[in-house]
């Protein structure tokens, strides 16, 4: 039985706004909160690069397959550094950035949280892209709450 109300919706939208501030993307900050039927927080997420990827720096070294069974740490030449730097800029960053909704779903999976029948709150309009919408459906999330077009 869901105990959703406008009061709780506003609280969870505000929490999604707070989590969006953790994103290092200066132009698009999105936060997501997944909540169970008793208003318990199951997971949170924000848009950003995958776990463990340093968004602030271009690495000078990286793992590369140079033969054999395991990757080897090798230096990156100037051309490769430039290619990696482009990943942090538009439009390339979109290929590497994980959306807040999917990050929240992945974070729930990491700790074994069941999302069946849960509600996803996010601070971004329009609501999920097609890829995120598929993930939301597959995760069993039954409701998405977000701001209307006039939300600040």
Model features per residue range: what roles?
Residues 1-152:
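Zinc-dependent deaminase catalytic domain
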